[in-house]
Amino acid sequence: MAIRSLFRKKNEDGQEKGFPEGLMTKCPECRHILLTKELEKNHKVCTKCDHHFKMTAQERVAYFIDEGSFVSMDDHLQTSNPLNFPDYVEKISVAKQQTGLSEAVLTGVGTLDGEEIVVAIMDSHFRMGSMGSVVGEKITRAVEKAIELRVPVIIFTASGGARMQEGILSLMQMVKTSVALKRHSEEGLLFISIMTHPTYGGVSASFASVGDINIAEPQALIGFAGRRVIEETLREKLPNDFQKSEFLLAHGQLDAVFHRKDLRNQVAMLVKMHTKGGVQHV
């Protein structure tokens, strides 16, 4: 018998007691044990090492958008199984139950420090934030709504890339979203892309990288192919910080890297600086 088991308390049924599930969270970076409640108060940033934990779409709305102002859009859109991929429908159903989302992106209209915006927030907890036809359609409709309202669009990306279960239909979303953003740009309207960990594949190669202002959170991994694939293809070792947001900033691929505690205020300031009407067509 292990010595530590002698000191474990038992409940009335003789079962060993432990911490209530969800009470504590271990930081994957520094291994520090945090009270989950304190972690959430700190916007899911480790108080010991500043590691930025992944956030759900709902958590980002609560943190980023003015309280009570967010109205979601297009939640009725449902994913089908165009290629009859085995178990795909079941996996989508499980993801819906686990996340409370209809798909891997939450879109809607709200205000940021009083300024009206349209926002799209990807959630990597839903099938790794992969982009299928519904994700692409929701982002496209969000951009079109921003054009209609003549307001900025802000997109938070967190994705493993295009969704393989939808084949070419998922790849088509790269073009569709980019074209919608081109129309938004032609109207003289602001698009801020905020890349969070991870942003990869078809998402990084399309709408995530074409913002008027491209921002990332600290230590976010951003790229097309993964590090291991690139190293095996090139047969050479890559820098330790390769594909991290700070590396991309140093090499001109990003405009800024903001700590999560500063992100809301910095983006609100950028929106106020750039929001006065856009191009007026006669």
Swiss-Prot record:
It is found in: Cytoplasm. The keyword Nucleotide-binding applies. It comes from the Bacteria. Its EC number is 2.1.3.15. Its cofactor is Zn(2+). SUPFAM superfamilies: ClpP/crotonase. Binds 1 zinc ion per subunit. Zn(2+) binds at residues 27, 30, 46, 49. The keyword Hydrolase does not apply. Transmembrane segments: none annotated. Pathway: Lipid metabolism; malonyl-CoA biosynthesis; malonyl-CoA from acetyl-CoA: step 1/1. Keywords: ATP-binding, Cytoplasm, Fatty acid biosynthesis, Fatty acid metabolism, Lipid biosynthesis, Lipid metabolism, Metal-binding, Nucleotide-binding, Transferase, Zinc, Zinc-finger. One of its GO terms (cellular component) is acetyl-CoA carboxylase complex. A zinc finger (C4-type) spans 27-49. Its main location: cytoplasm. GO terms for molecular function: acetyl-CoA carboxylase activity; ATP binding; carboxyl- or carbamoyltransferase activity; zinc ion binding. GO terms for biological process: fatty acid biosynthetic process; malonyl-CoA biosynthetic process. It catalyses: N(6)-carboxybiotinyl-L-lysyl-[protein] + acetyl-CoA = N(6)-biotinyl-L-lysyl-[protein] + malonyl-CoA. InterPro entries: AcCoA_carboxyl_beta, Acetyl_CoA_COase_Trfase_b_su, ClpP/crotonase-like_dom_sf, COA_CT_N, Znf-ACC. Residues 23-282 form the CoA carboxyltransferase N-terminal domain. Belongs to the AccD/PCCB family. Component of the acetyl coenzyme A carboxylase (ACC) complex. Biotin carboxylase (BC) catalyzes the carboxylation of biotin on its carrier protein (BCCP) and then the CO(2) group is transferred by the transcarboxylase to acetyl-CoA to form malonyl-CoA. Acetyl-CoA carboxylase is a heterohexamer composed of biotin carboxyl carrier protein (AccB), biotin carboxylase (AccC) and two subunits each of ACCase subunit alpha (AccA) and ACCase subunit beta (AccD). HAMAP family: AcetylCoA_CT_beta (MF_01395). This is Acetyl-coenzyme A carboxylase carboxyl transferase subunit beta 1. It comes from Lysinibacillus sphaericus (strain C3-41). The lineage of its organism: Bacteria, Bacillati, Bacillota, Bacilli, Bacillales. The gene is accD1.
